[in-house]
Design a protein with these regions (language model features):
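Transmembrane-helix motifs of polytopic, lipid-linked glycan transferases
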Residues: 226-229, 317-338, 376, 380
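Membrane-interface anchor segments at the N-terminal boundary of transmembrane helices
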Residues: 206-217, 313-314, 553-655
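Glycan-recognition surfaces in beta-rich domains, encompassing non-catalytic CBMs
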Residues: 13-243
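Membrane-proximal stem/loop segments at transmembrane-domain junctions that anchor or position
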Residues: 460-600
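Loop-to-helix entry region of an early transmembrane alpha helix in multi-pass inner-membrane enzymes
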Residues: 213-218, 296-300, 308-328, 345
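Membrane-interface alpha helices of multi-pass inner-membrane proteins
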Residues: 397-412, 423-426, 442-448
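Extracytoplasmic catalytic/substrate-binding loops of multi-pass membrane glycan-assembly enzymes
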Residues: 176, 269-281, 289-301, 309-313
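Short acidic/glycine- and proline-prone juxtamembrane loop motifs at membrane-interface regions
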Residues: 359-369, 411
Length: 713
């Protein structure tokens, strides 16, 4: 082990200790802004502020002590400060606080006499209905059936703290009048005259005082700059671990944070989150009437697991274990290559604290094991890359890779081209190991044939129906009709045979209007699919623009944020007035008793948080960060470019393969705006963040070692 000189100046250490105190104050205030509610000074708020303050002081001091012990080359300080500042600005901007609660709002309603009656029901501050006892009344109001009514000049005023989303509820109908509403200084007049009587809810997003925003942004930026700077200095100062033989299964410890947090989420949303797709597969597994519309292999796994314990929770636990073991195995492999265990724990915690993982891992979807398998493949490909292909030369490893690509091809139908293309890429990239790569490809083909051939026939698995199997073909034909493409008489007749020309529907966001069109003659396309594939290809050759537009429309999930197409995120629905205040199972089927939270106290606050991130109108920045697959891909590509700059090896592109091919296939053959389709890209992005931390640390240590050797010479 090379003893490095202690190059930290005493002034720098003193400055760091002063910054720790200020950082902890700013950090605890920033956390307070994230969690503040209507009651600004409560036991909960005090516990959060004090707890976060002492946590930051203790953690930062521990890291400073370690930095002083191991030493830190001061010349690297600029390399730390710049990314720390940029990340801090990013976090301070993208993580919004509940800042609206830090200012007092005044909401007033004035009836305009002579216009008619005003019926007012109440105010909701975004969290709850405001008690009517808090209203200040002026003029003559009648109060009956929890409603305020007046025909004369009268007013209602409420003063208090609220979220930035506030709503007022009135009644509209014949004879109703006009009211002047002041939304904390923003005045508008609203008429409630209507032909029919009904309830009307007026929503308003209240602006936050710019001074409060500046304070929040400044404290957040300072806190993150100092904390990230200390964290990076600590990581860089870590000495290279002594190379020793690791104990068998040493990597399993990294699964603990993930198993703990995901199990906690399962207890909150017990027995697991289930959509309509989940419940269809659950029913098939229990009736043992299998179809391949949802991959039959995944349904078989559900059948197998529920034969041990007949509960959705058993499936979720299996997903948690699969996820945690794959990630921890990947971390263990990096540690074998010299990564300090501290970075390993940081990677594990990164996966464990992600709200995207909290919600998705406990949802029973085929996309979850598929996405984890994509991550597993990426980890394996990094092993292949880092050994220049030699990893393939062991029979155990070849079988492992064959099983991995087999799972990818069986968990989702679009996984087959991913598996094939990656296998072919290995054959082309590593000539010395070509026979091993070919053997893996052959082994994969044999395994897949055994499952989809003899096994499926034995179990009488029904194939996909025509509307599923040829949905993309139908979608592209619909795109040509939407764009008024010029058709020959023969083409018009062939299209009319499938669906009458007047009944074709096109949506830029989903394939459902075509796939579930009641006029679709599925027998026609089933009996002669080649005919309609040729028809779609002919239309493309005649005029490719409608096809390209269709791909750009429905494939926007992959590469952009399309406000026209609302993404589907989760079956989790926030219901603040219900008991429980959320639903996470779409409907009830045999064997499913409904939502049965084991920790019901956490359901409301956690679901409220998720619900706000689901919306583009609430926590917009968190919505982009958590639920926009295009952001996953952009961050992934940026990190890959940084890794490529460090490694300077073109073969590194291999580890980008699973995410890139998956994204390309979804761009070309997407069917809906479901975020889960690209969940695998999110997991790979998190793994790339871990790779970057390791590569960054390794590169700095290598440079330091080289400079020391040059100095000796």
């Amino acid at each position: 082990m090379i003893n490095r000189a202690k190059r930290i100046s005493k002034n720098l250490i003193t400055l760091m200790h002063l910054q720790i105190f200020l950082m902890s104050i700013c950090g605890s205030f920033w956390i307070y802004c994230l969690t503040v509610e209507e009651n600004m000074i409560s036991r909960r708020s005090l516990a959060i502020v004090l707890g976060s303050f002492f946590f930051f002081v203790f953690t930062a001091n521990q890291m400073i002590t370690a930095i002083k012990k191991h030493g830190f080359p001061q010349k690297h300080l600029n390399k730390v400060l710049i990314p720390a500042f940029l990340l801090s600005v990013f976090f301070a901007m993208f993580i919004p606080g509940s800042l609206s609660y830090l200012q007092t709002r005044i909401i007033s309603i004035e009836s305009i006499p002579g216009t008619g009656e005003i019926l007012f029901e109440g105010i909701n501050n975004g969290d709850k209905d405001i008690p009517h006892s808090q209203f200040v009344l002026t003029g003559d109001w009648d109060y009956k059936n929890a409603q305020f009514s007046t025909n004369t000049a009268a007013g209602i005023t409420w003063t208090g703290r609220t979220s930035n989303q506030i709503s007022l509820t009135f009644q509209k109908g014949p004879g109703m009048g006009t009211a002047r509403i002041s939304w904390d200084g923003s005045v508008e007049e609203r008429s409630f005259q209507a032909d029919e009587s009904s309830q009307i809810i007026l929503y308003k997003t209240l602006p936050v005082n710019i001074f409060i925003k500046i304070i929040y942004f400044s404290t957040g930026t300072f806190f993150f700059t100092v904390f990230i700077c200390i964290l990076l200095c600590y990581v860089i100062s870590l000495p290279a671990p002594i190379l020793k033989k690791n104990s068998k299964g040493f990597w399993l410890k990294y699964a603990i944070p993930m198993i703990f947090t995901f199990s906690l989420m399962l207890m909150i949303y017990y027995p697991g989150i289930m959509s309509g797709d989940s419940l269809v597969q659950w029913t098939q597994a229990h009736n043992f009437q299998l179809t391949d519309q949802h991959p039959a292999f995944h349904t078989l796994l559900i059948w197998l697991i529920t034969n041990v314990w007949d509960s959705p929770a058993a499936i979720v636990i299996s997903q948690i274990l699969f996820f945690s073991l794959v990630v921890s195995w990947g971390i263990g492999n990096l540690q074998k290559k010299g990564m300090p265990p501290v970075i390993g724990w940081l990677i594990s915690i990164l996966f464990a604290v992600s709200p995207v993982n909290w919600l998705t891992v406990i949802t029973i979807w085929k996309d979850i094991p598929y996405s984890v398998s994509l991550l597993w493949l990426t980890i394996i490909l990094f092993e292949v890359y880092s050994t220049n292909g030699k990893w393939l030369e062991k029979i155990r490893n070849s079988v492992l890779l064959s099983i991995c690509v087999l799972l990818i091809s069986l968990f989702r139908h679009n996984g087959l081209p991913v598996a094939i293309l990656i296998s072919v890429l290995l054959v082309l990239m590593f000539r010395k190991q070509r026979k091993w790569s070919i053997a893996i490809l052959l082994l994969f083909c044999i395994f897949r044939w055994m499952v989809t051939g003899p096994l499926y026939q034995k179990l009488e698995v029904e194939p996909m129906t025509a509307n599923y199997q040829y949905a993309t073909t139908l979608y592209h034909i619909a795109a040509h009709l939407e764009q008024k493409s010029i058709l020959t008489d023969q083409q018009s007749n062939e299209i009319n045979e499938l669906i009458p020309l007047d009944d074709w529907e096109y949506s830029p966001c989903s394939i459902d209007p075509i796939m579930w069109n009641p006029h679709l003659d599925q027998a026609k396309i089933s009996n002669n699919p080649l005919k309609y594939l040729q028809l779609a290809f002919q239309l493309f050759l005649q005029d490719p623009i409608p096809d390209l537009k269709a791909v750009a429309d429905i494939g926007s999930l992959v590469y952009s944020v399309n406000p026209q197409c609302k993404p589907y995120i989760s079956p989790l629905v926030y219901k603040p007035t219900a008991n429980p205040p959320a639903s996470w199972i779409d409907f009830i089927v045999d064997g499913i008793k409904g939502e049965q939270s084991k920790i019901p106290e956490f359901v409301a606050p956690l679901t409220k948080f998720f619900d706000r991130t689901f919306s583009l109108n609430s926590l917009t920045s968190l919505h982009f960060l958590f639920w926009c697959p295009a952001i996953y891909l952009i961050i992934l590509l940026l990190i890959f470019l940084l890794l490529l700059r460090i490694e300077k090896k073109w073969t590194l592109i291999l580890i980008l393969g699973p995410a890139f091919i998956q994204s390309l296939i979804m761009l070309l053959f997407n069917v809906a705006q479901d975020v889960r389709f690209q969940y695998g890209v999110y997991l790979i992005m998190e793994y790339f963040i871990g790779l970057f931390m390791f590569f960054f640390w390794k590169n700095l240590h290598k440079r330091e070692k080289d400079s020391q050797q040059s100095a000796r010479k």
